[in-house]
Amino acid sequence: MGEFGEVTLGVAQAAPVYFDREASTEKARGLIREAGEKGVDLLAFGETWLTGYPYWKDAPWSREYNDLRARYVANGVMIPGPETDALCQAAAEAGVDVAIGVVELEPGSLSSVYCTLLFISREGEILGRHRKLKPTDSERRYWSEGDATGLRVYERPYGRLSGLNCWEHLMMLPGYALAAQGTQFHVAAWPNMASSASELLSRAYAYQAGCYVLCAGGLGPAPGELPDGIAAESLDHLTGESCIIDPWGKVIAGPVSCEETLITARVSTASIYRRKSLTDVGGHYSRPDVFRFEVDRSERPRVVFRDGDVDDRG
C-alpha cells in the first residue's frame, strides 16, 4: 500500500562573494551544512548563485564594463571541478540534496559560460545539470545558449526533482517537458523574485504541474562592496523575495526581502497526489492524439573532428 511522505524543503537566500569562486563555494558549503542541521531534504539556491548574477549587464559599454565581464568569465566553474567536488562533499556530509545555480565555464573554449542549474544528491554525486536554453535580453552579453540534455527529472527518495532558470518558465514548453516526466518538486531559480511576473510564473507552474516549487531569489553585494564602474542602482532588483509554493499555487513560506536567511517548509506529498488526481497535464489531462510535442535531448558538440573524435569537453 502506498503512503504519503513528508519532506523538508529549503531555500538559501544569500549573496555570493562576487568574483571569488573559492570564497563563494565555502559560503555555499556553510549554507548546505546549516540546512543539514535543520533537517532539510532539498536545498535550492538562486540563478547563477556561484559566482553571481551579472546585475550590471545593462550598464553602458566601457573599459570597466569589459573588465568586469572578463573577470566574470574567468571565475566560471567547471563541471565537474574542484568547486563541484567541494559542494558534493558538503551535500554528502549534510545529507541534503542541492540544486544550485552556477556560472558554468565551457571547458572546450575556456571563454564561454552558461547559466546552469546543477543538481547534487545527498550521496555526494552530481545528478545532472540544466543549461538555460535562452538567456533573456542583455543576459546574452554573458551566457551561451544551452541544449535540452538536462531537461529531465531525477528520481529521489522523496519524489521526482526538476528545475528551470528564470524566464524559462515563460517559455511554457520546457516546463511542460518536465511536467510530462512527472515532476513533484521543482526548483525555480531566479536572480530575484521581486517582480510580480516572477511570482506569477512560479505560482502558475506549481498549479499547472501539480508540484511544490522552491523559488530561489538572489541577493547582490552590499553597496560598499560594489566593483568600480558599477552604479548602486544596478542592485535595486536583487532583493531576494524567495518563497516556497504548494501544488495549489499557494505561497506557504516566505517571501523574505533583502535578508540573508534559510527559508524552510515541512510538506506532505499528499498535496501533490490530490492536485494531480484532478488535472495531471502530463498524464490524464492531456490529448496526445491532438497535440504532438517532441524534445531533442541529444548532445550538441561544437566540434566533430574528421577522424571521428568528438570534442565533448563542452
Curated annotation (Swiss-Prot):
Keywords: Hydrolase. CDD domains: nitrilases_CHs (cd07564). GO terms for molecular function: nitrilase activity. InterPro entries: C-N_Hydrolase, C-N_Hydrolase_sf, Nitrilase/CN_hydratase_CS, Nitrilases_CHs. Residues 7-269 form the CN hydrolase domain. Its EC number is 3.5.5.1. It catalyses: a nitrile + 2 H2O = a carboxylate + NH4(+). It comes from the Bacteria. SUPFAM superfamilies: Carbon-nitrogen hydrolase. PROSITE patterns: CN_HYDROLASE, NITRIL_CHT_1. The keyword Coiled coil does not apply. The active site is at E47, K132, C166. Coiled coil: none annotated. Belongs to the carbon-nitrogen hydrolase superfamily. Nitrilase family. Nitrilases catalyze the mild hydrolytic conversion of organonitriles directly to the corresponding carboxylic acids. Catalyzes the production of aryllactic acid derivatives. Mediates the hydrolysis of cyanohydrin to (S)-phenyllactic acid. This is Nitrilase 2.
